[in-house]
């Protein structure tokens, strides 16, 4: 039971209804006490009052989530040539409305900039750079592809019948630290806001949508034993990914799982590559020893330059302190492949890292297996 001074998590339909009505909502990754939250508003409904509320009470950076298609239409370049953000947040160059603003920083000016960016007939010359609004480019496939607030903002706005764009702002406490779920529940009660989760949004969408299509199945003989291999087409990126399945299990069983990304031709040649916490050979050997498990081999479309970098040993490792979560380009694809293979509970082979939204796919990490 929640007290009268806090707010419980609302179902996705209620969050969408508030977005459709032009109300601000709070969005967290999932129902976990440590989760931070963002204020989210469908960009079509932006007002100076809404921007002022975010600036006064949210206190974080006010951003505008946009689809890749809209960013390309507006000719918004990436903020930096190499994105070093741990969460893969895709900032573009900051923007300002070309007309109708003064200094650009006032609530009214920022609302005007958002309106200019999401207008039906918006053109690149309707905006100038830099400015006081920070666009974020969502990945194709939305939260099914990347479990981020950027994608959730676009998805929820689209589900509400609005332009797939949202104004978002992180919520901080009075002392400048990030508000966590218990703080957010009190904040929501004080301001009459609903709280939703990205995990619920993923579950809602994945019930009726899929990022993958199984295109082939056959038995494959490896040096460590026989596996059933499945090939999947990645609908957003059109790549082909593989899963290697060993044995059978009950829905409640925790099985060994290795998500191997990015898949490189060199993985099949070198058994001691430093690119991965588990080599492909070691992964298959461990799964065979367990008698059951799944290895998902994600193909990230390795370019000639990337292959050369791996050959020369200059590519970044797929594990280590800077890699806190799965590859964000293929996160949802890997999750849907695991679900299609019958995985519900897993012992993940690799170093512990944050994996937001997995509950939305019906997946639970029971533990981690490190070498």
Task: Identify the residue ranges that each predicted region occupies.
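Catalytic domains of riboflavin
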Residues: 1-371
């Amino acid at each position: 039971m929640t007290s009268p001074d806090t707010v419980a998590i609302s179902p996705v339909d209620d969050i969408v209804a508030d977005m459709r009505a032009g109300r601000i909502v709070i969005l967290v990754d999932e129902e976990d006490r440590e989760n931070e939250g963002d204020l989210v508003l469908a960009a079509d409904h932006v007002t100076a009052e809404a921007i002022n509320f975010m600036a006064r009470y949210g206190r974080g950076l006010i951003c505008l989530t946009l689809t890749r298609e809209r960013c390309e239409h507006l000719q918004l370049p990436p903020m930096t040539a190499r994105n070093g953000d741990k969460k893969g947040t895709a900032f573009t160059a900051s923007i300002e409305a070309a007309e109708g603003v003064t200094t650009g920083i006032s609530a009214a000016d920022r609302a005007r900039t958002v309106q200019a960016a999401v207008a039906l007939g918006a053109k690149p010359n309707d905006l100038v750079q830099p400015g006081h609004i920070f666009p974020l480019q969502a990945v194709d496939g939305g939260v099914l592809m990347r479990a981020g607030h950027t994608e959730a903002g676009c998805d929820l706005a689209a589900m509400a019948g609005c332009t797939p764009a949202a104004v978002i702002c992180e919520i901080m406490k009075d002392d400048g630290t990030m508000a966590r779920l218990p703080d957010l529940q009190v904040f929501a009660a004080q301001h009459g806001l609903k709280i939703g989760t990205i995990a619920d949004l993923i579950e809602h969408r994945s019930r009726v949508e899929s990022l993958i299509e199984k295109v082939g199945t056959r038995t494959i003989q490896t040096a460590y034993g026989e596996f059933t291999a499945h090939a999947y087409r990645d609908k957003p990126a059109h790549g082909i990914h593989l899963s290697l399945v060993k044995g059978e299990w009950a829905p409640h069983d925790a099985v060994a799982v290795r998500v191997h990304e990015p898949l490189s031709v060199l993985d099949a040649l070198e058994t001691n590559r430093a690119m991965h916490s588990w080599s492909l050979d070691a992964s298959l050997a461990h799964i065979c020893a367990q008698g059951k498990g799944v290895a998902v081999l994600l193909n990230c479309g390795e370019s000639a330059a990337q292959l050369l970098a791996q050959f020369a040993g200059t590519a970044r490792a797929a594990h280590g302190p800077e890699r806190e979560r799965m590859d964000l380009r293929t996160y949802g694809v890997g999750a849907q492949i695991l679900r299609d293979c019958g995985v519900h509970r897993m012992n993940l082979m690799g170093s512990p890292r944050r994996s937001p939204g997995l509950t939305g796919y019906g997946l639970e990490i029971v533990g981690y297996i490190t070498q």
